[in-house]
């Protein structure tokens, strides 16, 4: 009985972990061999669970949105508490991160991938804001420095 219950519990954990792994599969979605850096002034910050959002506007007027991923409540609280002063409106920040892969790049690197990619993450689009921690650039641009995009940053 104990063994059967343990096997059932393990199977249940694995079954429910798959969707979470797919959602947070960073090597699949981000190209960690490249990096993109954006510098500018903080336009707004939204502290919320599970992703806080920071908007940064470059001196040329281009805006980026950074989706700040926090790993757990303790980490999130610590990061948000320490970041509140540094990320005040008008503060100058530098954001560096890995650019998002295109659907074609994902399928080339992971031939068995049969899923879908949210079109918002692979199509070029002008973004209103930028944040600070790990980043994406728009995939169609040959020069990531000229991209307007969404950035994601791993919590530290």
Where are these regions (language model features)?
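Bacterial N-terminal signal peptides that target proteins for export
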Residues: 1-9
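Short aromatic-glycine-enriched beta-strand elements
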Residues: 48-57
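OB-fold/S1-family single-stranded nucleic acid-binding modules
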Residues: 100-142
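Conserved hydrophobic positions within beta-strands
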Residues: 40-42
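Short boundary/loop segments of OB/S1/cold-shock single-stranded nucleic-acid-binding domains
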Residues: 21-36
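Short nucleic-acid-contacting surface segments enriched for D/E, G, S/T with interspersed K/R
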Residues: 76-95
